[in-house]
Amino acid sequence: MAAKIRRDDEVIVLTGKDKGKRGKVKNVLSSGKVIVEGINLVKKHQKPVPALNQPGGIVEKEAAIQVSNLALFNATTGKADRVGFRFEDGKKVRFFKSTSETIK
């Protein structure tokens, strides 16, 4: 099945503590989750690793967020938009449902 949200897409968060925030997709996980730049930040307590000369402390990093809590951001309308699929020149492409504009 083709993915509606892919790496380097700009997405907007629909629900949760980061609702309304926009970010770029860094990684898509096979478990139906996505890691988005600057979204769903968590604090990780890290032990020092002297062998690697790594200091310990509290590190802030992005945690995975469910794909169902995200929507693709449409730059022409400035809003979240739904994604559809269609065939153009024998290739399957994604498009925005509201404007019928092809994505990338």
From Swiss-Prot:
GO biological process: translation
Molecular functions (GO terms): rRNA binding; structural constituent of ribosome
One Pfam match: KOW
PROSITE patterns for the chain: RIBOSOMAL_L24 (PS01108)
Entry GO CC: cytosolic large ribosomal subunit
KW Ribonucleoprotein (keyword) present: yes
Keyword tags: Ribonucleoprotein, Ribosomal protein, RNA-binding, rRNA-binding
Quaternary structure, from the entry: Part of the 50S ribosomal subunit.
Job description of the protein: One of two assembly initiator proteins, it binds directly to the 5'-end of the 23S rRNA, where it nucleates assembly of the 50S subunit.
Family per similarity comment: Belongs to the universal ribosomal protein uL24 family.
HAMAP family (alphabetical): Ribosomal_uL24_B
Protein name, as recorded: Large ribosomal subunit protein uL24
Lineage, uppermost ranks: Bacteria, Pseudomonadati, Pseudomonadota, Gammaproteobacteria, Enterobacterales
